């Protein structure tokens, strides 16, 4: 016997009547018939059947533990302590809710305040926002901010920079019409200071990375900052924060703005995201007022107790769009909290040990790679090592994949002048036997 109350279409009929239609077909009558398609969905399956099919598809993926990867070039395999995931999956943190109401968001706001405090200590600058989308967007926002502060219309960056970062920078600066000036590298794979001096005039900001895209530590960071400041430009440093346990903080090297990637702490590679961009400035009212994103501040409530709030909310949801410093609609709060938990767990000693192990593993990788290919640039490498081959690297890479090894990042499509070159990377997770297996495979094919 049919159930006359299923389905119940009364609410649908009421809504159609309210807007002047008799049926769903009438509502969409203006859509050309040729554009209306049948779904042609297959027969439904049980949840278990769907589980089996998806599991079969997912089993085709290989993790970096099953297939050692030397890919690098911006995304790296770091070990994440088990408690990080447990803590960020707590319902107090794992939410899409923006903490607009501080009276019910003290836990999240305090966690983000701790993130800001940790990053401030790490980069050597006192004012930090609660994150950007990623390193690339943070760098692009720094370019726009430099132009606003100095009222100049040129931003100087290294030619040897991630192709993805270049695309993001051009996307951000095309609308405002900010000119991007590129400076080449010298014979050591570092920024050419003489060319920088020629191109810095009229610049709003000068950007440099530590380490640079080739994995090399720029030896003249302080001198680059002096050249920028002598020209009246802001000095912007992009940093991989995992190196900051073993080198001087960029704020102590003269940086006005520091950007970087916080997601290297506490967050998996996950196909490249999500990320959390670091954004820090020195204690200057002009810079603070022009910062993009959110800043979490500590204050006192009506009862005189400590409280955390969002402060200087110069974003488009709070003020007129044209007046906003940035149109970033949200930050990467959960990613930033994960980074803060990991950083707090490491502490100063753990951070130093992390940097030392990465440096040691990179040096071993570089030494072994020099046995089978050319290392065109001298200097100290951190994580990435640029290697040049005589044969086609695309062919070499295919053979490595057959040997269950994921090789380096192919550079020729982005830097043709470097020939058949690639970036190979190591982190604290890179095992000696992985490197040895890579070299044995390269001996046969390179």
UniProtKB/Swiss-Prot annotation:
Q: What superkingdom does the record give?
A: Archaea
Q: Which InterPro entries match?
A: GcvPA, GDC-P_N, GDC_P, PyrdxlP-dep_Trfase, PyrdxlP-dep_Trfase_major, PyrdxlP-dep_Trfase_small
What CDD domains does this protein's entry cite?
A: GDC-P
Keyword Glycoprotein annotated:
no
Q: Which UniProt keywords apply?
A: Oxidoreductase
Q: Does Oxidoreductase appear among the keywords?
A: yes
Q: Which reaction does it catalyse?
A: N(6)-[(R)-lipoyl]-L-lysyl-[glycine-cleavage complex H protein] + glycine + H(+) = N(6)-[(R)-S(8)-aminomethyldihydrolipoyl]-L-lysyl-[glycine-cleavage complex H protein] + CO2
Q: Which GO terms describe its molecular function?
A: glycine dehydrogenase (decarboxylating) activity
The Gene Ontology biological process annotation of the record reads: glycine decarboxylation via glycine cleavage system; nucleoside metabolic process
Top EC category: oxidoreductase
Q: What's the EC number here? A: 1.4.4.2
A Pfam family the protein falls into: GDC-P
NCBIfam families named among the record's database cross-references:
PRK00451.1 (NF001696)
> What family classification does the UniProt entry report for this protein?
Belongs to the GcvP family. N-terminal subunit subfamily.
Function according to Swiss-Prot or TrEMBL: The glycine cleavage system catalyzes the degradation of glycine. The P protein binds the alpha-amino group of glycine through its pyridoxal phosphate cofactor; CO(2) is released and the remaining methylamine moiety is then transferred to the lipoamide cofactor of the H protein.
Quaternary data? The glycine cleavage system is composed of four proteins: P, T, L and H. In this organism, the P 'protein' is a heterodimer of two subunits.
Write down what this protein is called: Probable glycine dehydrogenase (decarboxylating) subunit 1
Gene name, Swiss-Prot/TrEMBL: gcvPA
């Amino acid at each position: 016997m049919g159930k006359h109350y299923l389905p119940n279409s009364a609410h649908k009929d009421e809504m159609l009547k309210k807007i002047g239609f008799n049926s769903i077909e009438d509502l969409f009558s203006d859509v050309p018939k040729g554009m209306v398609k049948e779904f042609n969905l297959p027969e439904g399956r049980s949840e278990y059947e769907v589980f089996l099919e998806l599991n079969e598809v997912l089993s085709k993926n290989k993790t970096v533990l099953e297939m050692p990867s030397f890919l690098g070039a911006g995304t790296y395999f770091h070990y994440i302590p088990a408690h990080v995931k447990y803590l960020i999956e707590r319902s107090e943190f794992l939410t899409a809710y923006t903490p607009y109401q501080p009276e019910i968001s003290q836990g999240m706001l305090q966690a983000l305040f701790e993130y800001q405090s940790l990053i401030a200590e790490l980069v050597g600058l006192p004012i930090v926002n609660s994150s950007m989308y990623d390193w690339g967007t943070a760098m692009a926002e720094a370019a726009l901010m430099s132009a606003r502060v100095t009222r100049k219309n040129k931003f100087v960056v290294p030619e040897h920079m991630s192709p993805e970062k270049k695309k993001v920078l051009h996307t951000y600066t095309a609308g405002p019409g900010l000119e991007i000036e590129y400076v080449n590298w010298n014979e050591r794979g570092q920024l050419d200071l003489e060319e920088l001096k020629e191109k810095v005039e009229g610049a709003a900001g000068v950007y440099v990375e530590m380490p640079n895209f080739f994995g090399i530590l720029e030896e003249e960071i302080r001198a680059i900052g002096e050249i920028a400041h002598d020209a009246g430009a802001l000095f912007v440093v992009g940093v991989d924060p995992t190196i900051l346990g073993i080198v001087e903080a960029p704020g102590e090297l003269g940086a006005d703005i520091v950007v970087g990637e916080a997601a290297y702490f506490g967050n998996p590679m996950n196909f490249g995201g999500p990320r959390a961009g670091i954004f820090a400035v020195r204690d200057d009212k002009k810079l603070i007022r022009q910062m993009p994103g959110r800043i979490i501040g500590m204050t006192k409530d009506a009862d005189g107790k400590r409280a955390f709030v969002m402060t200087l909310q110069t974003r488009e949801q709070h003020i007129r769009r044209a007046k906003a410093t940035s149109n970033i609609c949200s930050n990467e709060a959960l990613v930033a909290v994960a980074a803060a938990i990991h950083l707090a767990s490491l502490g100063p000693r753990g951070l130093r040990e992390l940097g030392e192990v990465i440096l040691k593993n990179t040096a071993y990788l570089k030494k072994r790679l020099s046995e089978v290919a050319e290392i065109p640039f001298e200097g100290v490498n951190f994580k990435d090592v640029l290697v040049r081959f005589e044969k086609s690297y695309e062919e070499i890479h295919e053979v490595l994949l057959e040997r269950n090894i994921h090789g380096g990042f192919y550079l020729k499509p982005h830097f043709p002048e470097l020939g058949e070159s690639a970036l190979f990377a190591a982190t604290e997770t890179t095992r000696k036997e992985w490197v040895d297996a890579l070299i044995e495979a390269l001996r046969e094919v390179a």
